[in-house]
Amino acid sequence: MATSAIQQSAFTGKTGLRQGNEFIRKRGNFGQARFTMRRTVKSAPESIWYGPDRPKYLGPFSEQIPSYLTGEFPGDYGWDTAGLSADPETFARNRELEVIHSRWAMLGALGCTFPELLEKNGVKFGEAVWFKAGSQIFAEGGLDYLGNPNLIHAQSILAIWATQVVLMGFVEGYRVGGGPLGEGLDPLYPGGAFDPLGLADDPDSFAELKVKELKNGRLAMFSMFGFFVQAIVTGKGPIQNLYDHVADPVANNAWAFATNFVPGQ
């Protein structure tokens, strides 16, 4: 019983904290709407990133903060000019989407930069530029993972597409629709087997890690947008663009390319 209580406190915060507002989260389940009530416990007040005295998006010059942005959730800087968080159900859905996209963006940013960085340091494994790597499947011989045909050898784009749809569709459908493996777990921060290092065991540290995850995730989403723009404008990967900028900052920067860029040329 004591062990169970300790584990429960690691995910809900310290005993005696004021419970926050109830949020209704609508979740699709194979075409049928399913509503679940979830009460969120306010994060540890010791953290400077939560509560009414948390940092705001413009610091002391921030305008009046909406009443529904109380600092209860990580990443809340009091900015909602468009009123996207006014509806509790929409707010809950948007928070879930932001966390998930943040995690994908962090993985994507690593995948866009790490292979190119390795190639710059002498590691050879075929095409390293992220937006060119996938096209190797159309080349003679197909696409070899890490340039090694003994690992994953892909020759059919249709097979890759079907595999992606089946595997990702199954996992995402299970996450959205729910299932026995997820019963009783927070859909965003499940813990347990998903936290093998026990990083969320301490509620104060857990509250800080939630903020760090969102801050880095937001940066990663902007980075991915920048990688797409760089690919369209320069036709180079992010590491090569960085090298070019360091070598000649005046000629290789966003302003220089924006003033000279002609679509289609």
UniProtKB/Swiss-Prot annotation:
Chlorophyll b 1 binds at Y57. Chlorophyll b 5 binds at Q164, F261. Its main location: plastid. Chlorophyll b 2 binds at R103, I152, L181. Binds at least 14 chlorophylls (8 Chl-a and 6 Chl-b) and carotenoids such as lutein and neoxanthin. Chlorophyll a 3 binds at Q136, L146, E213. GO terms for biological process: photosynthesis, light harvesting. Chlorophyll a 6 binds at H245, A254. InterPro entries: Chloro_AB-bd_pln, Chloroa_b-bind. Chlorophyll a 5 binds at K212, Q230. The modification N2-acetylarginine is found at R38. It is a multi-pass membrane protein. Chlorophyll b 3 binds at S156, E172. Chlorophyll b 4 binds at Q164, R175. The keyword Thylakoid applies. The LHC complex consists of chlorophyll a-b binding proteins. The light-harvesting complex (LHC) functions as a light receptor, it captures and delivers excitation energy to photosystems with which it is closely associated. May channel protons produced in the catalytic Mn center of water oxidation into the thylakoid lumen. The N-terminus of the protein extends into the stroma where it is involved with adhesion of granal membranes and post-translational modifications; both are believed to mediate the distribution of excitation energy between photosystems I and II. This is Chlorophyll a-b binding protein 215, chloroplastic. It comes from Pisum sativum (Garden pea).
